[in-house]
């Protein structure tokens, strides 16, 4: 089987637990997960049994090491990811929708 290679940005996704709004959760805890369209595609294909590689550049720090561990745990090949001593990991914030209230994304 061929390997699918995706190129793109991966970001940290911060959201309050459950269906809480930020004003209900803060000060307090936010959950950190990692997402980005291309990384999501690579992870989805890998979970279906396909071979995938993700290519990007990210700063080398403890948070991005956790991100790499997460991708590897989903069977996404990460050896082509460039770790740099500069730059930042992008962040975005999500409030999950509930009932008639839509989800809200803040960049």
Which stretches of residues belong to each language-model region?
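Short glycine/serine/threonine-rich phosphate/pyrophosphate-binding segments
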Residues: 37-38, 89
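Alpha-helix C-terminal capping segments
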Residues: 33, 40-51
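Short glycine- and Lys/Arg-enriched binding-loop motifs that mark or flank ligand-binding interfaces
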Residues: 4, 31-33, 55, 86
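Positively charged, low-complexity intrinsically disordered leader regions
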Residues: 1-23
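Short pre-catalytic strand/loop immediately N-terminal to key active-site residues, enriched for Gly-Thr
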Residues: 25-35
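Conserved N-terminal subdomain of the carbohydrate kinase-like
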Residues: 51-107
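Gly/Ser/Thr-rich helix-start
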Residues: 9, 36-37
């Amino acid at each position: 089987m061929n390997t699918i290679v995706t190129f793109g940005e991966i970001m940290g996704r911060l959201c309050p637990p459950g269906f809480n709004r930020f004003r209900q959760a803060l000060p307090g805890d936010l959950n950190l997960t990692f997402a980005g369209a291309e990384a999501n595609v690579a992870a989805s294909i890998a979970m279906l049994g396909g071979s995938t590689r993700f290519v990007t550049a990210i700063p080398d720090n403890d948070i991005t090491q956790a991100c790499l561990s997460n991708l590897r745990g989903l069977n996404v090949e990460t050896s082509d990811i460039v770790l740099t001593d500069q730059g930042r990991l992008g962040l975005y914030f999500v409030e999950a929708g509930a009932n008639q209230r839509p989800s809200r994304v803040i960049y």
